[in-house]
């Protein structure tokens, strides 16, 4: 998989059958993660029509993750609707995306982990005025999607587990003796060759 694209469903805080068809993972209002109908790998090749269609002209190689929220939301004048994104969903989103990035070896960058609203300005793929996710709980109104995306990416990065580098095996206590002996042997054989 090449990237992860984050959405809101524009529905209630409950996961619907339609949500399952369009996203690989959906987070309900309580922060629970639900699997979609299709696996992320189904989006490796979308020519067969059996894949999660979540982003116009950008589904191939893309994992679609959504928060179930924002039914009735209006961008201008802003109204979050009756089912706004919750803080619980934002935290669950960061954990899920961190796990997926680790599992699929996706680096957290603006080009590889982005919201639907960032696809057009970042990847230059037209998206018909999508603004998910340009607003999060605590914001008075939507903001620049890349700025909001940077906040989400920072949360995702903060949830990623550091890669443990195994310690160098300890050398046996007598290794210094073997090293010294090898140097002496090397010096003696050089003298004998001359």
PLM feature segments, named:
Residues 1-111:
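Active-site-adjacent loop/helix surface patches within enzyme catalytic domains
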